[in-house]
Amino acid sequence: MNPPVKTGFLLINKPAGITSYGCIGYLKRILKQKIKIGHAGTLDPFATGMLIVALGREATRLISHIMVMEKTYVATGKCGELTDTLDYTGTVLTTSDYIPSQEEIRTSLVSFGSSYEQIPPLYSALKHQGSPLYALARQGAMSVEDLQEIAGSKQRIVQLYHLQILSYESPFFTIQARVSHGTYIRTLINDIAIRAGSCATTYVLARTAIGPFDLAQATDLGSINTIEDINQRILAVDLNFFNE
């Protein structure tokens, strides 16, 4: 008989190549018992980093509170190349011979200020008539122009609490960004390049923090193999996290 699982939050360092839902499925196969489980914010399959998993009714009821917390990312973009997904897994749509300098990238970052209007990518989880945009894009049920019009209608103001360049090695640049809920880093990477006179595709994306939860606290998914592993790493529900 499997031991009971503790309830609370499990901080996972998601590896590349698996969906956020795939992480939930992996944990369900370990649990083998009926318990409410969910995650607080999707990461793209190619992305790595912080995925907060809620276990139990008390924790899952707080998912919506975690999802609106600010998030921190480290991302690397490649200038001069733009794909339909805005990441390296997509099909190249256009290229540019112009590669901005490090100083031009830095100037572009400053130009954003503390907020800007962002158009979500075509490949995103935002829904249109009940279907996520990424599903509509993959099905080919709508033209690219129609999808772009839909994405444009979902434009929103996003907050940029902190934005800095960490490294530059042409044509690649790496940034750290602390942003509001709903900010698409793939779009931000391309928008940075556009303001510097080029275009860019995201090659590396890692979420390093969600609100007060830091990646240093997280556990690699592959190191969790038993319920005991889960119980040893569960963070009890602490309402102080949500009252600050």
Residue ranges and their predicted role:
Residues 1-244:
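Catalytic/RNA-binding core of pseudouridine synthases
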